[in-house]
A protein has these predicted regions:
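Short beta-strand-centered aromatic/proline hotspots
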Residues: 57-68
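Residues that flank catalytic or metal-binding motifs in active/ligand-binding sites
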Residues: 3, 59-61, 140
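Short loop/turn segments at secondary-structure transitions that flank enzyme active sites
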Residues: 12-15, 49, 66-71, 150
Length: 207
């Protein structure tokens, strides 16, 4: 029986998860979810309520886990070549999450990415945390709303789908999962539907 792993997307940049190029992928951050989620489970990200965002209780994304790859498999898979970041390209190219290139002697080279320093240097803290769980979650059955998602109904909030702080909530009650799937299906859309919050803010500041 599938379960729901719910968490708050503290920084909705399009990096974790990355909803571009036909797949929603979770390759960085959230090692606990990447470790524990099984194929068929749902991963649900809800909005942050921090100052300047105020999207608490709104759906950012929902992805059904279809595949789980190692970092080496993810790096070498041609389907995910476009998820290797290019910070000098478009916004979508810049927030690529395929950032760990395996080294011959072991270890990883971290591509210049959202987990690198401002000068492009590798950040060991992120390398250690990201690669502590050698598992990248892949979904082609997802919806991503970013900053423009619907409010989650009270019946699902009451079931524990929306957290009040950091961490992960595991929803296992079959009726709650069925209610969530019915609601999600009723939205009538799939795939990439809206821009990440940070992308919206960047566009607003350029005006």
């Amino acid at each position: 029986m599938p379960v729901i792993h719910s968490y708050i997307v503290a920084y909705d940049s399009g990096f974790a998860p990355n909803p571009f190029n036909g797949f929603c992928t979770l390759a960085t951050c959230k090692p606990d979810i990447r470790k524990r989620a099984s194929l068929g489970d749902w991963i649900v990200g809800t909005g942050s309520n921090r100052q300047g965002v105020r999207r608490g209780g709104f759906l950012v994304h929902a992805m059904r886990v279809r595949e789980a790859l190692t970092f080496v498999e993810y790096w070498n898979d041609p389907r995910f070549e476009k998820k290797k970041p290019n910070l000098h390209g478009s916004y979508r190219m810049a927030c690529g999450d395929n950032i760990y290139c395996p080294l011959e002697g072991g270890g990883w080279r971290q591509l210049n990415s959202y987990h690198s320093g401002e000068d492009g240097t590798a950040v060991q803290k992120h390398i250690s945390r990201d690669t502590s769980v050698d598992r990248v979650l892949i979904s082609d059955d997802f919806v991503y709303f970013g900053a423009e998602g619907p409010k989650i109904p009270d019946v699902l909030r009451d079931a524990g789908l929306v957290l009040s702080g950091r961490g992960r909530k595991k929803v296992e009650e079959p009726a709650s999962i069925a209610n969530f799937e019915t609601w999600l299906e009723g939205l009538g859309v799939k795939g990439y539907q809206g821009r990440p919050f940070d992308m919206v803010e960047a566009a607003r500041k350029r005006k």
